[in-house]
């Protein structure tokens, strides 16, 4: 219950308490996220490298990625993070190996408090705010989060961010 109240308040507060933008070592942030998850016995793999810093709010980005990784581990047992560096944007793909979701539900799951009927259980927990928070953080940085069912199975969350805030 405490977690649900905390997440609801965070969502309602939005990004009004934004931390200042700074240069962020993406690989260090991802490795920290990986270590945090491994300490909890959760499998998170990182594939790819970023050679330049990203400009943004590191704690907000970590929260965004944590929400995506939490979903991947919760519904697909493990998370694979693929890092892609392009001249105009940084792309982080978080893939799970679970059942995916119906295409008709892909945009709906970004709505606050929306949960797929099959995901409502005591084991999975959650408030239905994780993806809404992740998308809000991405959009506050000029980017976005999209979902797609991966052709080899599972769900892939694609976080695309410009290198610098506008």
Q: What kind of feature is each model-predicted range?
A:
Residues 101-115:
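Short conserved segment of the HATPase_c
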Residues 142-143:
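Conserved glycine-rich
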């Amino acid at each position: 219950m405490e977690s649900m109240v905390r997440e609801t308040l965070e969502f309602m507060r939005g990004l009004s308490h934004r931390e200042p933008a700074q240069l962020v070592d993406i690989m260090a942030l991802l490795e920290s996220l990986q270590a945090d998850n491994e300490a909890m016995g959760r499998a998170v793999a990182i594939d790819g490298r970023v050679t330049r810093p990203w400009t943004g709010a590191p704690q907000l980005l970590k929260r965004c990625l944590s929400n995506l990784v939490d979903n991947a581990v919760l519904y697909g047992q493990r998370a694979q993070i693929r890092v892609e560096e392009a001249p105009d944007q940084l792309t982080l793909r978080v893939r799970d190996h679970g059942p995916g979701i119906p295409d008709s539900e892909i945009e709906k799951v970004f709505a606050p408090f929306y949960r797929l009927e099959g995901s409502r259980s005591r084991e999975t927990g959650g408030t239905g705010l994780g993806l809404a928070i992740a998308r809000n953080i991405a959009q506050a940085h000029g980017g976005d989060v999209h979902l797609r069912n991966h052709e080899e199975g599972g769900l892939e969350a694609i976080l695309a961010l410009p290198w610098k805030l506008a």
